[in-house]
Design a protein with these regions (language model features):
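A cross-family acyltransferase "interaction/gating" segment
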Residues: 1-62, 83-101, 109-121
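Anionic N-terminal interaction surfaces
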Residues: 132-187
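Canonical pleckstrin homology
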Residues: 216-265
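Phosphoinositide-binding peripheral membrane targeting modules
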Residues: 165, 171, 175-225, 237, ...
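Metal-cofactor-binding active-site regions of metalloenzymes
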Residues: 105
């Protein structure tokens, strides 16, 4: 990794700041809903000059990743910090893909501090400790992190199957221009090799393929679109027919990229 090469060449000690509580205050999928709580900043030495002089680039990279990795849920459990808000569950409906009780897909709704499955009624409130409080007869994971980890494991298992395929009809915009009109539409498919698009862009037939190897990850807006850079057409935002599938595409693609890169070393 380039950051590890830079650190090795510089040879200077590296300090790191780890922020606790920011995700629980304002998560990237909450659509701006802020919770009142506490944020702590922890300063630590990530690497000394002596360590840098003897570490491999991979060891340097691993040390850097470990120094900035955070787990707000573990921090909350150890610190006991509570969060207040009347929209604690906002955005959850866009990342809870599978119901743990009835296995329905894309069935969750959220309003205020509550989530519920539109298929079986499985429901819970989000408490001040950001853990789920299941309502009568409901079955939910302990918190959002545990739910996402369970889903991610299933997405990865699906992606490892030989016949793996995700497909969706899409509408397309130029990335970064969310208020602009759509510039195209078509079909987006992801298999174990990469992402394929076929459709119309700017009034012309368009087709392209992006190999997982050159795409280290997918970003976008949960519940809405995926961002995919493309050489001929620039950065594009693909709005899936089922926006709640964005997280599924994201985790599957990141796994397939990592698997390809690892196999080459």
């Amino acid at each position: 990794p380039s950051i590890a090469r830079l650190v090795r060449r510089a040879g200077a000690p590296v300090a790191a700041l780890r922020i606790h509580g920011s995700f629980l205050t304002l998560s990237r999928f909450s659509h701006g809903a802020m919770n009142k709580g506490r944020i702590e900043i922890e300063k630590r030495m990530a690497l000394t000059a002596e360590q840098i002089s003897v570490y491999t680039e991979q060891q340097i990279y691993d040390a850097l990743c470990g120094a900035i990795a955070f787990d707000d849920y573990a921090w909350q459990r150890s610190s006991g910090v509570l969060f207040k808000g009347n929209k604690l569950a906002q955005g959850y409906e866009n990342i809870l893909v599978r119901c743990p009780k009835c296995a329905a897909r894309y069935s969750y709704h959220a309003e205020g501090n509550r989530i519920w499955c539109g298929s079986c009624g499985n429901s819970a409130d989000v408490g001040a400790d950001m853990r789920f409080i299941p309502l009568e007869g409901s079955n939910v994971p302990a918190d959002l992190q545990e739910w996402i980890r369970t889903q991610k494991a299933q997405f990865i298992q699906d992606a490892d199957k030989k016949d793996f395929l995700l497909a969706s009809e899409v509408r397309v915009k130029s990335y970064g221009l969310s208020n602009s009109p759509y510039i195209g539409e078509g079909s987006l498919r992801m298999d174990r090799q990469g992402i394929h698009f076929k459709g119309v862009l700017d009034g012309k037939d368009a087709e392209f393929f992006v190999d997982h190897q050159i795409l280290p990850g997918l970003t976008g807006e949960f519940g809405e679109y995926l961002y995919i850079p493309q050489a001929d057409h620039g950065p594009l935002a693909f709005y899936l027919a089922q926006g709640k599938a964005v997280i599924e595409w994201k985790f599957a693609q990141e796994h397939l990229h990592s698997k390809i890169v690892t196999s080459q070393h």
